């Protein structure tokens, strides 16, 4: 009986560490952390992935109630959150780009209550939906799960690694939030700026024209037309952002 209890405790100690890393990743990564994926589904997915990764390596037996165990808990949470946050940069770039487009169209006050992101402009919400579909079409959910499972080979549990190169990589990658937003929003913003200048010239030539009655509907209509015409190029840019995020995850695992 004592032998059986000891085996169960040892199994729990070995399953605990991959479970913590996988759970931290599922709580922060896009698509897996949305409200539509309930806590029950995330727990079941974490258990399934833990059971899949368990035969792939020899797991150290570390008591979580010791100082070494507490250190290992924080380490696994850090790794899982790190990998999930690298993907969240793409979602942040879409929100910033959507906000810029909405402001140019005069829709900055037209917000939707997103349970995941809070108050998000309608254009940003539209881009997030498109990016989710592109993420699934690329097989992103399979790619990130395979990278997560590969992390147990490249960043083994119980081994220390230098955090400074990882922090430098995170800071470098965070600039993609603004670069991605510029890539998505700049063509539409420049076009709307030229239309705005044209409306200003018309107002100057015909002062009796009520620019507020004509300008706002014209900007919204022009923005919708430009957005529909630019969807092909926007889709390619979103695809490029996701592919870069997969590369940076792979690079982060290599740096560690």
Task: Identify what each model region corresponds to.
Residues 1-256:
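Hydrophobic alpha-helical segments and their helix-loop boundaries in membrane
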